[in-house]
Curated annotation (Swiss-Prot):
PANTHER family: TRNA MODIFICATION GTPASE GTPBP3, TRNA MODIFICATION GTPASE GTPBP3, MITOCHONDRIAL. GO terms for cellular component: cytosol. The lineage of its organism: Bacteria, Bacillati, Bacillota, Clostridia, Eubacteriales. It is an enzyme of class 3 (hydrolase). This is tRNA modification GTPase MnmE. (6S)-5-formyl-5,6,7,8-tetrahydrofolate binds at R23, E87, R126, K458. Homodimer. Heterotetramer of two MnmE and two MnmG subunits. Disulfide bonds: none annotated. NCBIfam families: mnmE_trmE_thdF, PRK05291.1-3, small_GTP. Mg(2+) binds at S238, T259. Gene3D superfamilies: P-loop containing nucleotide triphosphate hydrolases, Probable tRNA modification gtpase trme, domain 1, tRNA modification GTPase MnmE domain 2.
Length: 458
């Protein structure tokens, strides 16, 4: 069966480096690698003890040495895949690594599909689906905070929470089944059961909704905050970008319209991954290139989680500033009153009525810390706890929404005195939606799609 043949792939990033690892997993892993291994003093791998390493050489079909290696062996089920696993530590480098992999495949292994090692760990019951997805989140984490959140999920904290919710749903279904059986036996129904079912549904729905409430914060920790810097040309947007990056990334001149395109960078904002977008100024222009930049700026504003509006305090507000303010007023924003190190000329009732204003000098760095604090206040209530259970995955959030909607349906049925067996249909649907998060209830095609998004060797 394809799922349980022996697979192999490069587990480390392909490129020049000191060491690369080829991972081989399956019940013939040791036998296959042994065919192309020659140990020092003639030792092979068939007598290697689990969780030990052996030094030697990889050889080809002509018994010529390919590379100097150290081979480790993990006996299933105490391995990542829960299968016998061999890892070949060879020299890094594209040629050497691929040569070793090619010979492993010639010896009888199959090249692994993307995510197939993690998929086997899931299919073999070592981890559930949410833990498997956390593995990829650890790999792609952009900050220590996002990695810590992914580690929490990989250790099964979210899985435990979901399994507890599923148990509560099963308890509700058992209670309904008891009541329905009671009625079918022509016995007098217990009038307290619908009341108890309603109480339990309300409690379960509350817990599901509490998890949903963590999703926005969780998504920001996992994927990052999209933040757009917007304002008139030469207001100091590029200087702010450089101040946040601590390097000269954007061109800073006194010529209006210098930033003609959208500049994007990732920064680590006290553990929060932030995708920072420095836009071209928004203004009417006849310059074709600059006009394209202005349109891109508007697109980025519409996509952003947060808009940073920069105003120049060294001059009066003009019509162009007012147009920008009007464009972003219905979005989550912070107003930066820049160039406070210069003589102040800005005075406007429109500005006075704006929220979340911060005075700063992008040139000197004054006010940057206040900006960082304000961002955390707006999105994380001033503090971030990446170790608490939270929903970071859009797929999980959608499943929780479906569970909540079905529990709403169950509650409406109970309020309308519908038959309990009809109410149970909604509760069963909620149970299945929760099961999709851990993989307890999921179609095979969707499982394959999830793992296909993983990188090779993982």
């Amino acid at each position: 069966m394809k799922e349980f043949d022996t697979i192999a792939a490069i587990a480390t990033a392909l490129g020049e480096g000191g060491i690369a690892i080829i991972r081989v997993s399956g019940n013939k892993a040791l036998e296959i690698v042994n065919k192309i291994f020659r140990g020092i003093n003639g030792k092979d791998l068939l007598d290697i003890k689990p969780y030990t390493m052996r030094y030697g050489h990889m050889i080809d079909e002509n018994n010529e040495i390919i590379d100097e290696v150290i081979v480790s062996f993990m006996k299933g089920p105490r391995s990542f895949t829960a299968e016998d696993t061999v890892e070949i530590n060879c020299h890094g480098g594209i040629v050497a690594t691929n040569k070793v992999l090619q010979n492993v495949i010639k010896a009888g292994a199959r090249l692994a599909e993307p995510g197939e090692f993690t998929k086997r760990a899931f299919l073999n019951g070592r981890i559930d689906l949410s833990q498997a997805e956390a593995v990829m989140d650890i790999i792609t984490a952009k900050t220590e905070l996002s990695m810590k959140s992914a580690m929490t999920q990989s250790q099964g904290r979210l899985s435990t929470e979901i399994n507890n919710l599923r148990k509560e749903a099963l308890d509700i279904l058992a209670l309904i089944e008891y009541a329905v059986d009671f009625t079918e036996d022509d016995e007098e129904p217990d009038e307290t059961i619908p009341v108890k079912v309603k109480e339990d549904v309300i409690t379960l729905r509350g817990k599901v909704n509490n998890l949903i409430d963590t999703a926005d914060e969780g998504k920001l920790i996992r994927d990052g905050l999209s933040m757009v810097i917007v304002g008139k040309p030469n207001v100091g947007k590029s200087s702010l970008l450089n101040a946040l990056l601590n390097e000269k990334r954007a061109i800073v001149t006194d010529i209006a319209g210098t930033t003609r395109d959208v500049i994007e960078e990732y920064i680590n904002l006290d553990g929060i991954p932030v995708r920072l977008v420095d836009t071209a100024g928004i203004r009417e222009t006849e310059d074709v290139v600059e006009k394209i930049g202005v349109e891109k700026s508007k697109e980025k504003i519409n996509e952003a989680d947060l808009v940073i509006l920069m105003l120049d305090t060294s001059r009066e507000l003009d019509e162009e500033d007012k147009e920008i303010i009007d464009y972003i007023k219905d979005r989550k924003y912070i107003v930066l009153l820049n160039k406070v190190d210069l003589d102040r000329k800005l005075s406007s009732e429109i500005v006075d009525n704006l929220e979340n204003k911060i005075e700063l000098s992008a040139k000197t760095g004054f006010g940057i810390d206040d900006l960082k604090s304000k961002i955390k206040d707006l999105f994380f209530n001033g503090s971030i706890d990446a170790e608490s259970v939270m929903v970071t995955n859009t797929r999980h959030k959608e499943a929780l929404y479906r569970a909540s909607e079905n529990l709403d349906g169950a509650l409406n049925g109970l309020n309308n005195n519908e038959f309990l067996d009809l109410v149970s249909i909604y509760v069963t649907s909620a149970l299945r939606a929760l099961g999709e998060i851990t993989g307890a209830e999921l179609e095979e095609d969707l499982v394959n799609k999830i793992f296909a998004e993983f990188c090779c060797g993982k």
